[in-house]
Amino acid sequence: RGGKLIWMINGVAMNKDSLFNESGKSYALPQELNLDDYFFHKGVRIEKTLIQDLYCAPIVLASGYENNTQYVPYPWVYYPIIKPKDSIIGKDTGPILCRYASPIKTIDNKLSKFLLLKSSDFIKTSSFPAVINLKKATSKIEPSTFLQKSKAISYLVEGQDYSLFKNRIKPFKFNGNMEKGKFEMVIISDGNIAENQIDKGIPLSLGYDKWTNNFYSNRAWIVNVIHFLAGNKNYLSTKGKKWNFAFFDISKINKFGSFWKWSLILLPFIIGIFSLFISSRIRNKQLKL
């Protein structure tokens, strides 16, 4: 019958809590929701793979024992940070955090499709079944293996189409049935994009990461999607905050990261020793006078 829909679909079925048990492993399998035919009818397909992106958010792991425990952030390629497309929905919206997202492919048909979210140009994909191991977080990232170009994570699909259930036998008589209608839907291949983190049983603001104290624009983007589908274009046109994205060059970070890390550690120490030496020399000269 048409209408407005938001789909937030996990292409992967995985127990995330298993990552933090003794083995530090979890198994990713295809998520079977019996929606493949429906999405194919609308001209999109959620692939049975998992995106790994060089431009990613960290995962925070505990290091040490008892009172000496420290929480250390490590880049986690399964947490892509997405820059929204410059559309009426994504305009003036900051970076969005995705978790365990799958690529979306489009299929040619008469419906209109507009790209809303996509990964960076430095990715690779994992086929299912896949083993997700936390040891990967502490291993050195090899940028040379991230050779695939960007993959779509969200599309707006709109148009007028026949129902997937056309010509099927109805379980009961329904006089108001319409087999063709106008519709708009947003499909997102990440069911975690609208998931709040929980702290002491209380849900935190959507987009806030309690482990890194970072704020992402998940909430603002989802609100924009809802306003767009509800026809509230005035709300979207009056937004005026500008975001300037400055992504790091991952290849340079991996090449020179160790040098700058040790420089930042040792340089203050060397400056401190030099300052003590100079002040000691000045003090000795003053005592001799």
PLM regions and their residue ranges:
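Acidic, S/T/G-rich, low-cysteine, solvent-exposed domains in lumenal/extracellular/periplasmic regions
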Residues: 1-234
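Short, aromatic-rich amphipathic segments at membrane interfaces
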Residues: 235-264
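Selective detector of the "anchor" transmembrane alpha-helix that sits immediately C-terminal
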Residues: 257-281
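Cytoplasmic C-terminal tails of single-pass
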Residues: 286-289
